[in-house]
Amino acid sequence: MANTPDKSSMWGGRFGGGPAAIMQEINASIPIDKRLWEEDIAASRAHAAMLGACRIISADDAAAIDRGLAQIAEEFAENGVPVDLSLEDIHMTVEARLKELIGEPAGRLHTARSRNDQVATDFRLWTRTACERIDAGLAALQSALLQRADEHADSIMPGFTHLQVAQPVTLGHHLLAYVEMARRDRGRFADARRRLNESPLGAAALAGTGFPVDRDATAAALGFDRPMANSIDAVSDRDFALEFCAAAAIAAIHLSRLAEEIVIWASQPFGFVALPDAWSTGSSIMPQKRNPDAAELVRGRAGLLLGAFQRLAVIVKGLPLTYSKDLQDDKETLFGAFDALALSLAAMTGMVETLSFRTDRMRALAASGYSTATDLADWLVREAGLPFREAHHVVGACVRRAEELGVELPALPAADAAAIHAAVTPDVLAALTVEASVASRMSYGGTAPERVRQAIAAARAAAAQGQD
């Protein structure tokens, strides 16, 4: 027996039967796209105002529609969005409630509009706000990193390559690396916001509309820079969502790297940081454990965010122009990416603000592993006139001999040093301190405490001027 068509459906006139129950379930997006209710109502109010101003509908109908939409916004804000699968999506949910409130004029709201340009408009508005909220989260993380970098501009730690001690750096300098990554992340979201800020509204289904609409007016009312120039492009492309997911994936990679370092630094072999109770968990069987779960979860969320970009790319990669229902799944993907990144940023900011750094252990490890060997090679170039490659060879021989004796370079016996090269004297070796090493790195972007403080001041000045 065929299902009876739903007379309240917005599109059921040409159908003799209603959808199967499973069809209704797979077709409905209201459980997901109800998050667009504020954007949908805002866009509908702008559209109704334009219809009235252009005399496409009467001023009385436009006013009634606006009052009804304002009431719906109040209802949804107070009680949430009702979920009725028969209404499919947020657009039809709003329109159905509007009809209950104002009657026949509600049917005039959709004049010169399709759900294709409606959803594209809502989605761009939502993504625009999402870019701004992620930017605020990145700014908060930058601020926390800058504060901790300022506190530790002089604190010495080992710099690593291949996770082997390489050269001494300051903890402040190390943290500033993540400030720079966050700066570029903010730039990517700003670029994404700028490119998405064009209005699809008025493109209708795909070909535009025969009504004398004012697309510039609705674009301006919604804060867009301009209407989109091609109606097919307006309803069919989701590159703005892809760009958001790409920026989110890169930001998540940066967060994951910092999270990994916190996990490593908190481990007993390193012991560089003490995790606060607020950002740790324990074990159900081992009472001594303090696990860096917050950092591990941030690291894990990066996989979700990388997957979000891939998922959305696979959805859109083979779609012919213009609209296909595959695009219904774009919103769940982007919503999930936003939620994961926003939560990760908040968690990482909290950890950075409250980590206790064990700078004594950091300095001790920084002074091991022949970390000042490059300083000795540089001295031989500057003071003894050796070509760098020869100096590199000489210092390598010194390190090899020190390893054989089980000592660090400053403790290499004078006779052994002199046997390698006469310029390597006890006084020279004694000057190979980690403090002298970091102080000498005065090149722009270097780890010298003076340079670190300059970089912090520059970053704060840029933030104050909105130039991150």
Swiss-Prot record:
EC number: 4.3.2.1
Single GO MF annotation: argininosuccinate lyase activity
Pfam families: ASL_C2, Lyase_1
One cellular component (GO) term of this entry: cytosol
GO term, biological process aspect, one: L-arginine biosynthetic process
NCBIfam families xrefs: argH
InterPro entries hit by this protein: Arg_succ_lyase_C, Argininosuccinate_lyase, Fumarase/histidase_N, Fumarate_lyase_CS, Fumarate_lyase_fam, Fumarate_lyase_N, L-Aspartase-like
Pathway: Amino-acid biosynthesis; L-arginine biosynthesis; L-arginine from L-ornithine and carbamoyl phosphate: step 3/3
Chain segments annotated as coiled-coil in the UniProt record: none
The protein, known as: Argininosuccinate lyase
Localization, UniProt: Cytoplasm
Predominant cellular place of this UniProt entry's protein: cytoplasm
Gene coding for it: argH
Family statement drawn from the similarity comment of this UniProt entry: Belongs to the lyase 1 family. Argininosuccinate lyase subfamily.
Catalytic activity: 2-(N(omega)-L-arginino)succinate = fumarate + L-arginine
